[in-house]
Amino acid sequence: MLQVTNLGLRFADRKLFEDVNIKFTNGNCYGLIGANGAGKTTFLKLLSGELDSQQGHVSLGKGERLAVLRQNHFAYEENRVIDVVMMGHERLWDVMNRKNEIYMKDPFTEEDGILAAELEGEFAEMDGWSAESDAAQLLEGLGISVEYHDMLMGELDNAIKVKVLLAQALFGNPDVLLLDEPTNGLDISAIKWLEEFLINFENTVIVVSHDRHFLNNICTHICDLDFGKIQLYVGNYDFWYQSSQLARRMAEDSNKKKEEKIKELQEFIARFSANASKSKQATSRKKMLDKITLDDIKPSSRRYPYVRFTPDREIGNDLL
């Protein structure tokens, strides 16, 4: 579980987030959507701890592990592909290397044996003995055949590196998985495999993607980021769109009725406030008027592209 409490962040005079409160729970996949520049990637960096918030805090469940899809394709040039995937579980990778270093020591002391036994126990608890086969399975699922597994990352083209880094994020069954545009650079078969993986994933996923079909297939919730606030919807992308449009229409209809009522009350007050026999009614209407407040309906920060053709002149009636 990942919980955000009173989160706030400002860049110069721009308020990016304000009093964001949200809880991400196990077994759910959350699609984070919003206009370009709304702060989706920044929000993921706040969740991962890569950025510090200026207000509030982010808390991860005790003993839980968070994994992030890395974007630096050149960070592991001298490492084997299979090793890069296993590096996704930092504690497992550290224990694996430490125990291997101990076994290579000469002389091998009694203290070394005790420490090695402790590390072996921890390694087994993390399913370390199946780590390499699990990593290979992820790579093959994403379309990276076995002949690439022992190659160095520097020998691969970017299309394969993208898949390796995705496998790294998925490795080791993380408790919370943060994915920023995970379908970028993937072929159709890899996207389908990823969809199936995430649908069957039992922990928490938070994903940013411009692919609404992908979000429709995997998301149980949509987090709509707009004007520094996050509105949570239960359902996939299409459900969010229908629900948000319906909620907006209902708010607009409510405001329209309130405006009509305000006009009616104002006309009554203006007409009868000076009339002695109607003054009490006018006073009562004024109290009613003071209690009416219109809903604050902000226009969305989203801007949808369109093409407009403006004719230089009207077309003639006669064709020559």
Please state what every model-predicted region is.
Residues 1-255, 312-320:
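ABC ATP-binding cassette signature C-motif
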Residues 113-130, 246-320:
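Flexible nucleotide-interacting loop at or near the entrance of a catalytic core
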